[in-house]
From Swiss-Prot:
Entry protein name: DNA-directed RNA polymerase subunit beta
Keywords: DNA-directed RNA polymerase, Nucleotidyltransferase, Transcription, Transferase
Disulfide bond annotation, renumbered to this chain: none
A GO term for molecular function: ribonucleoside binding
Amino acid sequence: MDLQNYGAAPERVDFSKIKTSIPIPNLIEVQKKSYERFLQMDLLPNEREDIGLQTVFNSVFPISDFRGVSDLEFVDYSIGNWECKCGNLKGLHHLRSTCRNCGATIRTDPFHAGDILCHHCGTFNKNVVTFCNKCGDPVGLQLKYDMQECQERGMTYAAPLKVTIRLTVYSKDPETQKKSVRDIKEQEVFFGEIPLMTDNGTFIINGTERVIVSQLHRSPGVFFERVPAQGYFLGKIIPYRGSWVEFEYDNKNILYVRIDRKRKFYGSVFLRALGLKTDEQILRAFYRVSKMEIRDKKIYWNVDEGLTGLKLSHAITTKSGDTVVGQGKKITASLFKELQKAKIEKVEVAPNDLEGAHVVADVVDMTTGEVMIDANSELTTTVMSKLIEAGITEFEIFFPERDDVGTVIAATIRKDAVKTQNEALIEIYRKLRPGDPPTLDTATQLFQGMFFDPRKYDFSRVGRMKFNIKLYDRSDATALDKRTLDSDDFKSTIRYLLKLRKGIGAVDDIDHLGNRRVRAVGELLENQFRIGLVRMERAIKEKMSVYQEMSTAMPHDLVNAKPVMAAIREFFGSSQLSQFMDQTNPLSEITHKRRLSALGPGGLSRERAGFEVRDVHPTHYGRICPIETPEGPNIGLISSLSCFARINEYGFIESPYRKVIKGAVVDEVKVLNPGDTDYKVGDIVRRGDMDEANRKLGGKKQAAEFEAHCEYLSAWEEDKWTIAQANVELDEKGRIVPDLSNARQAGNFVLKPKEEIEYIDVSPKQLVSVAASLIPFLENDDANRALMGSNMQRQAVPLLRADAPYVGTGMEMVTARDSGAVVLNKRAGVVDSVDSERIIVRVEGAAHEGQLSREVGADIYQLTKFKRSNQNTCINQKPIVRVGQRVPKGAVLADGPCTDLGELALGRNVLVAFMPWRGYNFEDAILVSEKLVKEDYYTSIHIEEFEIEARDTKLGPEEITRDIPNIADSFLRNLDESGIIRIGATVKPGDILVGKVTPKGETQLTPEEKLLRAIFGEKAGDVKDASLYCPPGIEGTIVDCKIFSRKGQEKDERSKAIEESQIQRLQRNLQDEIRILTDERAKRLGTLLDGKKLLADLHDEKTNKRLLSKDTELTRELIEKMKSRDLKRMRLANKDPRLNEQIDEIEEMTSRQIAVLEKITDEKIAKLRKGDELPPGVIKLVKVYIAMKRKLSVGDKMAGRHGNKGVIARILPEEDMPYLPDGTPVEIVLNPLGVPSRMNVGQILETHLGWAAKALGVQFATPVFDGATEREIKKNLTAAGLPTSGKTALFDGMTGTQFEQPVTVGYIYMLKLSHLVDDKIHARSIGPYSLITQQPLGGKAQFGGQRFGEMEVWALEAYGAAYILQELLTAKSDDVYGRAKIYEAIVKGEAAIEPGVPESFNVLIRELQSLCLDVELMKKPREVPDTALAAD
């Protein structure tokens, strides 16, 4: 699907040479997919997989009480109320039908036009949706408050979670203790409201939009690393949940185990606890054992693989006397095979051949019962002679030195004093719980629970898969659902660790993306939910044990879901990964949702993260953007997903590649609908074969539908293959042209012949993130500047008039669509009406066979008008379609902030000259033409929200009113009779926005006040002014007021007026929907009766007046005017017998739909009139929105897309700006010295190409790493009649003279960033002081002062400005007495300064007193005796 055609923007001239057939996956799919898998909200209980919520419930339930007489079991859960508009159809089963082929249940989709696929058998079925016979609507999720209402009312956008729980009560036989079921009760328990994700991948929590950032953490599994200082190796088994185990050895070759980073103990203790009780069992588990026999005082070795590598003292001969291995010759692998071939079973060995051998088991003299040699003891020649003498016939040996595992296990067993399993368990308990007296039961319980209890230990499917890949080299070696460990797992781990000493195997790179995985929203929430459920489980168990009579208990008596909901609330409200959405512009929203953070619970911390974790790793290629990351302490810890990357079911990031076979790129497609071809759904077929199959069908049969296919590989899968870059030259048949190509192999760049290449990149874009892919000529910019460029695009403020860039990258359309900023059409149809606030699309439904189409009526799109974003920027949508236009599904109907005809537009195209101008653009400063200010190029609207609430106080209720004591009428001129400012009023700092009075406590009145009170009445005195005033720095227009009143409170006039306008809007929507339905009715009747002739006159039933005469031909206009009862009475030529039925059906369906629409509108109106749910104690809440127009001004920060940022130093009159030979003045002058040292040459190329684009009247797309070449830029400049150098003569606007050198001129896309001088400028006269130090507070938010620091004091000291210094350091700082005196002096007109004691001196005294030093201040100086001076 070509996305370009779905916006209204003109198509761009594309410079890319590599055409990518794979569309970019939906950019916010990461969030949506993860949360869908977690909730499984639209699935029936029997359709749900064991993931997300389902798996959490299954893992915590069933819950049994301590006595074992009752169980609580989880049955299923449901989220939200699924019903039609009128509530007649209830339940998700109405969105299901049965497959005609296999009889399985399949999901139907009311918004899908075509057939639907059965996932069991791959057959396509008719999409038969059950519609309600009253309202004509299918079942859908019905919510109490929609997203907009939640944002306005400060509520959470959520749906109710109901869980069906079964309580089983048993009775125990007192004698046999047998349990029998006494009672079973099942009940649906309301758990609470679970937040829902909006269509844009965000959550609305307490009225604000939040994003849950995905976390990048260490994957569970088994890891081996080298300890650099000591040079030995370390093995770790890291579970998803549970205890960590570490295995290590020291330079004495002793194996140690450490559990949960506690004290270490011998590895043999751990192995005994696992069930390898004796030394022999441990040795057999790790070493290769060979069997020896003694016959006729000679030693024979039973032939096995242990012989390889040995030199034998005796030659080996066959029965026929042929020598296979000569005396003293080493037995190689090939010689060993010959031994086997010759079927030699035993070979003679001399005692010295067994040097270094140890015995596996105790060797016992059968006659005396004496142990001749202990297990794990070395077999010396002396011992050998003893064994021969004692008549021992056989024993088993192993060679620790020669074995892959080495001497570690044997050495550890010798060192270890613990010899039995019970001792081992108690020893482990002592190490883990020092101080607790161990008993065998508690020790066994602790050890068993640590690794073998699924409730306490979860290795997870991911952990098991990583374990299999590492130790067995294939992901399915053991079952992935085996989520606890067993002794074999530990043995395999220890064996691998010990083999590493011999150089067998490889250590792991912890920063490899095969060892780091992404925890997205769903998984993070699943963990929170589990924490809550475990807390709830404890409470339930306690309740069950104290409940008197379980037979009368119901599940809801035992289940209290508060801890679960508290855990979820805490996660959304205060988790480090739940963040206030960055909503500056659509790009910042998308980037925030695609962000990956290594911080957060269970992750790293800024302080501990080293350089390696932050660095770019070869596996980031195509998965994580190497460019986009914040500057500062979080660099490298917070990153962004690449354009094409996706996250697989295990949480690993995958990147797409196309297959290469024998040097040719395979163009594959995936079958979506086989039609009449022989393929099945999901088959991967070569494009040529598919085209051929479709061609063979001819025009009559249904052709197959397909989409481009590529293979997604994870980081460790990718390491196995050789992968070429996307820009490898291919011929027209897709064959690689050069014999040697650049390729990647296991993270290294290599040159490979084309036959060895196995995959090729999908697109050059796949390396970078969305923000970086929007930078044209990214390949010509230094990486540091590209980083700044991609970060600064996210700070661009939405401008009053958006303007798409002349030089884009082709990603603008995709980004704008997926961000949710633009309005997309849900169903194909025709635009019925358009105004600034809404768009109505008349839906054209396709009728099914013999059925009337249900898909009639209209889609009404309410546009967002001047809404405040999280960052106080303005969200405003403007329609870009016209009435009568046909719009396909997915077309852009309206532009949002920062979009222009469906394309992302963060800034404006401006004419730029690179030249110095009188020092005003020194050091990155920017010189701007006044034209940009006059023509509102960079004017933006910012909306501030202020709220005030009237509460119930102890002294009486607060009141929102116009009647404020001691306030002049001029201050109240803009307030209405309710005390709330009118919309459209212009306000400045200090103006009253909402008048409010608060009752104040009774005070003792003076006689004069009593007299005044008696004359002027009681009211004025007992209330004080608590109005909402406009704060400093805010100057603008009131654009909206929202008033929320508590239920049952009398509404004021303003509330009623607002309510009335909302009701009118609802009724207007209703009228439009009814109009469309009646039009549709007339249209359908028209198609039924159009062109039919009357056989007789038609008279009115009541008046008998002739309505139509005989032989009249019916037209649509006539039919529309007539009533249905008259239509039914007409006698028509060749009238269809079912005609009257069809007329009835159309009429009935229309009237039913109208009735339901009216009912829904009435409900909405009733909800409006009912009053609002407010926090306790709040009577009324008023929100006032002020829109401020921010024009471009000196001090604003501007930037290009290449990291070229600067601050406006001067706004110059248009006539003074340098101008082109044709008299056009330039709009911005930048300093050319900002380019060479920064190495962001991309901006110069953009300047040239932008100039050509403006002159040719086209827009260009130059995708990253595949953009316009220098030759192409020159070609376009020539076509536009511009100099190919990109330079031209410029003239000084002030003098009219020509500048000496030609100057680079062209169009650059410049952004205004959200660092506006109006938000930063700040001044203080008198303001708040810190309570303890009595020094002024700092910062604009606190209305603070400017710090006069140590160095500034030195400067004044250098000038000897003593009085200024004294005033700064005392009266203007913390001399409380002094500042009061200065105020007095100013009032009296005196100029004296009387200093007091600075408060910091008092603070110092208090500090010393707190250290128990008795410091007293003397009033008078003490007389110093002469003797003391003499002594000095």
